[in-house]
Regions:
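Residue cluster at the C-terminal edge of the helix-turn-helix DNA-binding motif
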Residues: 51-54, 82
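A short alpha-helical element within helix-turn-helix/winged-helix DNA-binding domains
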Residues: 26-36
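Beta-hairpin "wing" of winged helix-turn-helix
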Residues: 53-68
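Short amphipathic alpha-helical interface segments
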Residues: 10-22
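The C-terminal cap of the DNA-recognition helix in HTH/winged-HTH DNA-binding domains
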Residues: 19-22, 33, 51
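Key DNA-contact positions within bacterial/archaeal DNA-binding proteins
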Residues: 40
Length: 150
């Protein structure tokens, strides 16, 4: 399963925000420069994360971004679902975006031989992503504040 550049950049931006948690706001240009993220793309990512309730922002010369929640309360799964949408390998096993497989000969049956395996794949991916928090990555970077839950 491959994640998008949007998720990759979003996670890298959140590493910067995690390192600044409990400190001064960080400006998007600083995030862009430190993480080599194109500023136009970063603006879209930060807006999506803000709209999802993970970030706060302040406009103006002393403005910038900050995490609303502590980094030990934000999982990779949350971030990736916000930026990329559901991670199910096929739509008929998605928890959040379930769709019947329209062209599948088993769609109207009670059992699909593929669905069970794909459900296991979905659950394994979710288990990994939902059990790793931003604070773990900040710790590996040697960053983060004492309040970050490290």
């Amino acid at each position: 399963m491959k994640f998008s550049k949007k998720s990759e950049y979003g996670l890298r931006a959140l590493l910067e925000l995690t390192a600044h948690y409990g400190k001064a706001l960080i400006q998007r240009q600083e995030i862009s420069d430190r993480q080599n993220i194109p500023i136009e793309f970063l603006e879209q990512i930060l807006l999506a994360l803000k709209n999802a309730g993970l970030l706060a922002s302040k406009r103006g010369i002393s403005g910038g971004y900050s995490l609303i929640k502590p980094p030990d309360q934000i999982t990779l799964g949350q971030v990736i679902r916000i930026l990329d949408g559901p991670r199910a390998p096929i739509s008929c096993v998605s928890k959040t975006a379930y769709q019947k497989c329209g062209d599948c000969p088993y769609a109207d049956k009670t059992h699909c031989p593929i669905q069970g395996v794909m459900l296991d794949v979905r659950n394994a991916i979710a288990d990994v992503l939902d059990n790793h928090k931003l604070s773990e990555f900040a710790k590996q970077m040697g960053g983060g504040s004492p309040d970050a839950g490290l």
